[in-house]
Amino acid sequence: MQAIKCVVVGDGAVGKTCLLISYTTNAFPGEYIPTVFDNYSANVMVDGKPINLGLWDTAGQEDYDRLRPLSYPQTDVFLICFSIVSPASFENVNGKWHPEICHHAPNVPIILVGTKLDMREDRDTQDRLKEKKLYPVSYEQGLSKMKEINAVKYLECSALTQKGLKTVFDEAIRSVINPTLKKKPKSSKGCIIM
């Protein structure tokens, strides 16, 4: 059985842990407890191949900026997560997460994941954002960001409803077992750290 290491990164409270717990247990966790570091494992079949998927949850908070990269060696695929209803977490995709991954683990495939899909159409959430002159991140904005950071895919999901959830992990696995499907960089710019 092929083992694949998948590391999940993104701002605090974007739903990384909920994503992993919902996927591995089919249950949505009740309360928010910030993660320092956690590991999950799932045996799955993708395209007829048995895979042991090692899932590494990381802390998004700045306090752990020096600790988090210790989980990056030997990573096969990264999920960079942002919340669809948090424009700030979306900006941090290339403000923080993409540069950090490029620095510590260049040339590892990245899947860009928009979480909390169920909240995009939620009236209360929209009103709360409008008060700050903000709007939920659109699918088109996600696709544009995917191209900007040269990610393999952009996917959206909800850990609460599980919509799109299995697809996120199936595509993460496919980016490793079918590397020929990876997009070729448009140029040889590589990572730019500012």
Curated annotation (Swiss-Prot):
Chain positions of motif Effector region: 32-40
GO molecular function annotation: GTP binding; GTPase activity; protein kinase binding
Alphabetized PROSITE patterns for the sequence: RHO
Propeptide: 192-194
Keywords attached to this entry: Cell membrane, GTP-binding, Lipoprotein, Membrane, Methylation, Nucleotide-binding, Prenylation
Membrane topology: Lipid-anchor
GO cellular component: cell projection; cytoplasm; cytoplasmic vesicle; cytoskeleton; lamellipodium; plasma membrane; pseudopodium
Pfam families per record: Ras (PF00071)
SUPFAM superfamilies to which the protein is assigned, alphabetical: P-loop containing nucleoside triphosphate hydrolases
Annotated binding of GTP, by residue: 10-17, 57-61, 115-118
Any one GO biological process: regulation of establishment of cell polarity
InterPro entries: P-loop_NTPase, Small_GTP-bd, Small_GTPase, Small_GTPase_Rho
Lipidation, S-geranylgeranyl cysteine type: C191
Location within or outside the cell: Cell membrane
Major localization listed first in the record, in broad terms: membrane
Annotated function: Overexpression promotes the formation of filopodia and membrane ruffles.
Family: Belongs to the small GTPase superfamily. Rho family.
PANTHER family: RHO FAMILY GTPASE
Subunit architecture: Interacts with pakB. Interacts (in GTP-bound form) with rgaA.
Protein name (Swiss-Prot/TrEMBL): Rho-related protein rac1B
